[in-house]
From Swiss-Prot:
Cellular component GO terms, alphabetical: cytoplasm
Role description: Nucleoside triphosphate pyrophosphatase. May have a dual role in cell division arrest and in preventing the incorporation of modified nucleotides into cellular nucleic acids.
Protein name per Swiss-Prot or TrEMBL: Nucleoside triphosphate pyrophosphatase
Cofactor: a divalent metal cation
Length: 210
């Protein structure tokens, strides 16, 4: 029997990363209150702790709602990403005004994109071993002309992504580069997930669906 991969995220970027890496996951979106978790941790919580707590909460929520036939043998992947700039963590801007302000702050500078990952091994309907870890990648932002920034914000893309930018979409035009793992910037670090799967005694090739 093939172990099924379950992605606990609505992120099209994370789904694309897995698909391009040979895995067609089942997508089960969690109903986690992210703001409540961040508030409970407090402003002084380290960024890796914050994203790992969010990823773990998402994975736990998804485990509880797995279809019976999938819970027989699967691994759940929960992720969450946030950008740290000037010691402050930011998630999805949500509004055009917030996205515009975010870009005005980070244009021409560098920030750290943190992604928390939580993998839960589920067999015979029971959640077993769990791995939780974060990865960080430095992102170097360009300085888009005002008209370009306005067009990008108007596209709607930056409103629903951590840090108000994407590497693999329209936002990629306005990045000068990344130092580290690019898949982590998209929202799921393939090198880290491979190591976490190995610790769960799961082989990456055995999970390929093509």
């Amino acid at each position: 029997m093939t172990t099924r991969v379950v992605l606990g995220s609505a992120s099209s970027g994370r789904l694309k990363v897995l698909r391009q890496a040979g895995i067609e996951p089942l997508v089960v979106v969690s109903g986690v209150d992210e703001d409540a978790i961040v508030a409970a941790l407090g402003a002084a919580a380290p960024p890796d702790q914050v994203v790992c707590a969010l990823a773990a909460a998402k994975a736990a929520s998804v485990v509880e709602s797995l279809p019976t036939e999938v819970a027989t043998d699967c691994v759940v992947i929960g992720c969450d990403s946030m950008l740290q700039l000037d010691g402050r963590l930011t998630g999805k801007p949500g509004t055009p005004a917030a996205a515009r302000a975010q870009w005005q702050q980070m244009a021409g500078r560098s920030g750290e994109l943190y992604t928390g990952h939580c993998l839960v091994r589920v067999r015979d309907g029971v959640a077993g071993r769990r791995e939780v870890e974060a990865a960080a990648t430095t992102v170097r932002f360009g300085t888009p002309p005002p008209a370009d920034l306005a067009a990008y914000v108007d596209s709607g893309e930056p409103l629903g992504v951590a840090g108000a930018f994407t590497l693999d979409g329209l936002g990629g035009w306005f990045l000068d580069g990344v130092d580290g793992d690019p898949s982590n910037v998209i929202g799921l670090s393939l090198p880290l997930v491979r190591r976490m799967l190995d610790r769960l005694d799961l082989s990456v090739p055995a999970l390929w669906t093509r």
